[in-house]
């Protein structure tokens, strides 16, 4: 249905009225051209008749010198012929309006998923509300993947279903709209608007192209390692991705002629967005202060095994596998999902010319730059000042609104920001209540029983636990929620099965970041980069799964050897 609607929308419409027909050339020099009122008269035209004869009665087709035979007196002329009514013009048929609603097949797939799970008997130990919410949640996930409607609409329908079935109260269903993370992501899009509108984004982008732009790969690596250097100082991956790198990457894409919606996404933007997202997940796993939920892992580790993970412990253990991942992942994506622009030796020269043409910074560029520095400074030192990331972002946006660098109408026009806020908050709410209703605890306990009863070595048992912990993240829209729900249980089981406790804790801590690369909602940077609309959802999930395998191989393989060398096991 979606493809039919698309074809109806994009195909030109033709009117059958005579005005749309091309004028016909005269058949001879003596005959005038004929403008026909309908397709029917065109088909019945005789080439031997002029236009005047074509519309005359048969008796008038005789030559003028011959009188028509009449029984009446010559003094009584024949009555004039009855006028022949001209054929009525054929009116243009009414245009068929394209279908504006949902794509039927994806919608049915989403509904059917929920209905099937809903009517499966509730397992022992699971409450009915938890099972109903699981059915609605998975139905919503299928809808988000197949997209019968935009993501925000699908998520809103999921919340509506949970309230309608009394699975959640209204306040519970919409509780996550008060969560800071969705708002931080939305605010990042407003910052990006100011970044691009003022031209500051273009200026910085051209500087990057001037320094590293002779190849797309060099440009990508310059962004990757810049983000990794900022990671330990900015403890919010949403803030790093949305407030700093999304505006910069979008400006780079536009500067290189890669835009959304005109078929040029694959020139540079698709590869660059996916690369920056996947490497933001890696850099978040490399430092204790690189992601907001990492200190939670450290706290739960201390509560479970009585030993804390220090900042240097974390950084030393993550350095080698993290560095290898930062090098391998962009290169792998460059091979399997390559940009169309690979080499541009003239790009640095052209970028320099653009910078010369732009001249000195404008007033609005200066305001934008100072505001960005203020916001980043609060992200770095806000913990000591009692200012969290979203409050810092609101303060920065307030400065932009007061100075007129960004207007509120422009913020309202950022439909992607509001759409992302809607679907991300909806998923956070549903995933959070799956945990509150005890479904995640039930799942963890059953995994523990099954793996513990297999009689495997601690290495094999830990490998099974790692895979289950990692890929269960498809059911979470927050790293913190996943850690809070499953970290303690899996760490306890791994330790009981013989895994060195500190090794198990630090590996699960790293995986709590890396698993965010699976989906477009699994970590704070995911909806930021996905919301730029350069990469279609199937590719986002597909390459997310591929990179997850590569990361597991690197972190458990290369990382395992490194951890052996530094004495973790």
From Swiss-Prot:
GO molecular function: alpha-ketoglutarate transmembrane transporter activity; malate transmembrane transporter activity; oxaloacetate transmembrane transporter activity
Transmembrane stretches, start-end: 106-126, 134-154, 172-192, 241-261, 268-288, 317-337, 367-387, 388-408, 423-443, 450-470, 490-510, 543-563
BP terms from Gene Ontology: alpha-ketoglutarate transport; malate transport
UniProt keyword terms in alphabetical order: Chloroplast, Membrane, Plastid, Plastid inner membrane, Transit peptide, Transmembrane, Transmembrane helix, Transport
Pfam families in the cross-refs: Na_sulph_symp (PF00939)
PTM notes: The N-terminus is blocked.
Locations listed in the record: Plastid, Chloroplast inner membrane
Expression sites (tissue/organ): Expressed in leaves.
Gene Ontology CC, one term: chloroplast inner membrane
Family annotation (InterPro entries): CitT-rel (IPR030676), SLC13A/DASS (IPR001898)
Feature: compositional bias, Pro residues: 75-90
Transit peptide extent on chain: 1-93
Chief localization: plastid
Low complexity composition bias: residue spans: 23-74
Region of interest: Disordered: 23-93
Induction comment from the UniProt entry of this chain: Circadian regulation with a peak in the middle of the light period.
Family per record: Belongs to the SLC13A/DASS transporter (TC 2.A.47) family. DIT1 subfamily.
Subunit (UniProt): Monomer.
Task performed by this protein: 2-oxoglutarate/malate translocator that transports carbon skeletons into chloroplasts for net glutamate synthesis. This translocator exchanges malate for internal succinate, fumarate and 2-oxoglutarate but not for aspartate and glutamate. Involved with DIT2 in primary ammonia assimilation and in the re-assimilation of ammonia generated by the photorespiratory pathway. Imports 2-oxoglutarate into plastids as precursor for ammonia assimilation. 2-oxoglutarate is converted to glutamate, the end product of ammonia assimilation, which is exported to the cytosol by DIT2.
Protein name in UniProt: Dicarboxylate transporter 1, chloroplastic
The species this protein was found in: Spinacia oleracea
The organism's taxonomic lineage, starting at the top: Eukaryota, Viridiplantae, Streptophyta, Embryophyta, Tracheophyta
């Amino acid at each position: 249905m979606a493809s039919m609607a698309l074809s109806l929308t994009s195909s030109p419409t033709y009117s059958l009225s005579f005005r749309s027909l091309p004028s016909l050339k005269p058949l001879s020099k003596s005959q005038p051209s004929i403008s026909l009122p309908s397709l029917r008269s065109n088909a019945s035209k005789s080439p031997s008749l002029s236009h005047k004869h074509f519309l005359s009665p048969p008796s008038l087709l005789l030559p003028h010198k011959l009188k028509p035979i009449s029984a009446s007196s010559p003094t009584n002329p024949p009555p004039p012929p009855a006028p022949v009514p001209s054929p009525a013009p054929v009116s243009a048929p009414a245009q068929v309006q394209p279908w504006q609603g949902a794509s039927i097949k994806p919608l049915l797939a989403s509904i059917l998923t929920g209905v099937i799970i809903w009517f499966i008997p509730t397992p022992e130990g699971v409450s009915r509300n938890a099972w109903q919410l699981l059915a609605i949640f998975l139905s919503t996930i299928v809808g988000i993947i197949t997209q019968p409607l935009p993501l925000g609409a699908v998520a809103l329908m999921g919340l509506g279903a949970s309230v309608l079935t009394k699975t959640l109260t209204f306040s519970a269903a919409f509780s996550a709209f008060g969560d800071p993370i969705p708002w931080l992501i939305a605010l990042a899009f407003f910052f990006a608007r100011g970044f691009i509108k003022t031209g500051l984004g273009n200026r910085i982008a051209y500087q990057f192209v001037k320094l590293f732009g002779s190849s797309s790969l060099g440009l990508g690596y310059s962004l990757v390692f810049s983000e990794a250097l900022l990671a330990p100082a900015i403890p919010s991956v949403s803030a790093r991705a949305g407030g700093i790198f999304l505006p910069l990457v979008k400006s780079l894409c536009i500067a290189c002629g890669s835009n959304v919606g005109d078929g040029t996404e694959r020139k540079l933007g698709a590869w660059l967005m996916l690369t920056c997202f996947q490497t933001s997940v890696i850099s978040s796993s490399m430092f204790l202060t690189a992601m907001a939920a990492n200190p939670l892992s450290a706290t739960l580790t201390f509560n479970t095994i009585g030993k804390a993970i220090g900042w240097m412990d974390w950084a030393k253990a993550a350095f080698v596998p993290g560095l290898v991942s930062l090098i391998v992942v962009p290169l792998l994506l460059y091979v399997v999902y390559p940009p169309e622009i690979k080499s541009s030796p003239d790009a640095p020269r052209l970028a320099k010319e653009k910078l010369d043409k732009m001249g000195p910074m404008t007033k609005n560029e200066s305001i934008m730059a100072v505001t960005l520095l203020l916001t980043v400074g609060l992200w770095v030192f806000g913990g000591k000042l009692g200012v969290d990331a979203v409050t810092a972002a609101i303060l920065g946006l307030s400065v932009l609104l007061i100075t007129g660098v960004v207007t509120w109408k422009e913020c309202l026009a950022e439909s992607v920001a509001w759409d992302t806020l809607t679907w991300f908050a909806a998923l956070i709410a549903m995933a959070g209540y799956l945990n509150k209703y005890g479904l995640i605890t039930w799942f963890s306990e059953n995994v523990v029983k099954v793996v513990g009863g297999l009689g495997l070595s601690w290495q094999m048992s830990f490998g099974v636990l790692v895979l289950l912990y990692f890929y269960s993240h498809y059911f979470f829209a927050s790293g913190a929620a996943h850690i809070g729900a499953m970290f303690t249980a899996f760490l306890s089981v791994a330790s009981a099965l013989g895994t060195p406790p500190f090794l198990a804790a630090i590996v699960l801590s790293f995986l709590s970041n890396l698993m965010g690369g699976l989906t477009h909602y699994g970590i704070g940077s995911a909806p930021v980069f996905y919301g730029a609309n350069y990469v279609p959802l199937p590719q986002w999930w597909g390459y997310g799964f591929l990179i997850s395998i590569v990361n597991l191989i690197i972190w458990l393989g290369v990382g395992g050897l490194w951890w052996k060398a530094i004495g973790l096991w």
